[in-house]
């Protein structure tokens, strides 16, 4: 039963999780239970509410699909890549992240538990924990790309959720799971981070280049702490 915004988000997520399994590594039916609190023979709703659809993209999809996403990606001016907890990164992994950073207007937000150190990385934890809610407005991205496990930054998630109307959220997950910490997840890329960053770096438009504006916005504020 949807009584408010949180209920709506939760139901949207559950329905997306269920329907996305219809053709996920095989096909088959799904069953969705809907509570009915009273009997009624009347259904007079002419227009159903608009809901969010979460797409799943995998390496076995046509390459044209990935190029379409690369074209969209090149048009974003403020891309926040959030690295959650990870075990380790190989040299090849870091090289792919750096190639991506050079091609797109982004920064890579890391924490100690991210275990990622390479070009484009910023330790954003001090800034997110010290900033007031209103200060995040200028730093708010128009695209979030997240990967890894839990994000330790206590205040970052609430700040992101408070500005969820301003951005799109892509998640990288090797199992294709829906993990919607922003309340705004739109696309799940079922692949490794290395595949994702390498693929988009290679499919970037020829003239695509990080102008460093968004990176410098975060870096300058961090230096002021």
Regions found by a protein language model. Give the residues of each.
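Active-site donor-nucleotide binding/catalytic segment of nucleotide-sugar enzymes
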Residues: 77-89, 215-219
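Short acidic-hydrophobic, aromatic-tinged amphipathic segments that line or gate anion-handling sites
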Residues: 1-2, 123-132, 186-200
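Conformationally flexible catalytic loops at phosphate/diphosphate-handling active centers
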Residues: 17, 21-75
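Glycine-rich beta-alpha junction loops
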Residues: 34-40, 85-87, 113-114, 176
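Conserved acidic residues
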Residues: 77-79, 142, 186
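Phosphate/pyrophosphate-binding active-site segments
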Residues: 162-225
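Conserved thiamine diphosphate
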Residues: 1-27, 202
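Glycine-rich, anion-gripping cofactor-binding loops and their flanking helix/strand elements
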Residues: 83-170
